[in-house]
Amino acid sequence: MRVLGIDYGDSRIGIAISDPLGWTAQALETITWRSDVEVPLKRISELVEEYGVKTVIVGFPKNMDGTVGARGEKTIEFIDLLQQRIKDIEVIKWDERLTTVAANRTMYEMGIKKSKKKLVVDQIAAVYILQGYLDSKGKVL
């Protein structure tokens, strides 16, 4: 069973997908949107159907002290809309603290040019979010 990972943002949403066995996460795409939340909801719904996803992991931003700020509240609203749109999935909030930092470091180490970073940073962050969840499930090769 595949699991979808989401790095939610105000203008871009990074998407990652697990392998069929649920061991590894791979970058899938970035959904670009501005004000119409229907755009990402529709695309995520299509991906859930296309890949047979039953569980969606959404990166949940917390402050370093563990409190929930404005971005966290927006993410909760998005999760609520996602659950209303797609009834038969489990949506899990996953602590995303420092995932963007890790994604930027990965891109630096890979030598990805600054002009291309914006295109993939959200996907890489989604991979870190999803892989963290998958690793917590304790599957061993």
UniProtKB/Swiss-Prot annotation:
<keyword id="KW-0963">Cytoplasm</keyword>
<comment type="function">
    <text>Could be a nuclease involved in processing of the 5'-end of pre-16S rRNA.</text>
</comment>
<dbReference type="Pfam" id="PF03652">
    <property type="entry name" value="RuvX"/>
</dbReference>
<keyword id="KW-0540">Nuclease</keyword>
<protein>
    <recommendedName>
        <fullName>Putative pre-16S rRNA nuclease</fullName>
        <ecNumber>3.1.-.-</ecNumber>
    </recommendedName>
</protein>
<dbReference type="GO" id="GO:0004518">
    <property type="term" value="F:nuclease activity"/>
</dbReference>
<dbReference type="InterPro" id="IPR005227">
    <property type="entry name" value="YqgF"/>
</dbReference>
<dbReference type="InterPro" id="IPR006641">
    <property type="entry name" value="YqgF/RNaseH-like_dom"/>
</dbReference>
<keyword id="KW-0690">Ribosome biogenesis</keyword>
<dbReference type="InterPro" id="IPR012337">
    <property type="entry name" value="RNaseH-like_sf"/>
</dbReference>
<dbReference type="GO" id="GO:0000967">
    <property type="term" value="P:rRNA 5'-end processing"/>
</dbReference>
<keyword id="KW-0378">Hydrolase</keyword>
<dbReference type="GO" id="GO:0005829">
    <property type="term" value="C:cytosol"/>
</dbReference>
<comment type="similarity">
    <text>Belongs to the YqgF nuclease family.</text>
</comment>
<dbReference type="InterPro" id="IPR037027">
    <property type="entry name" value="YqgF/RNaseH-like_dom_sf"/>
</dbReference>
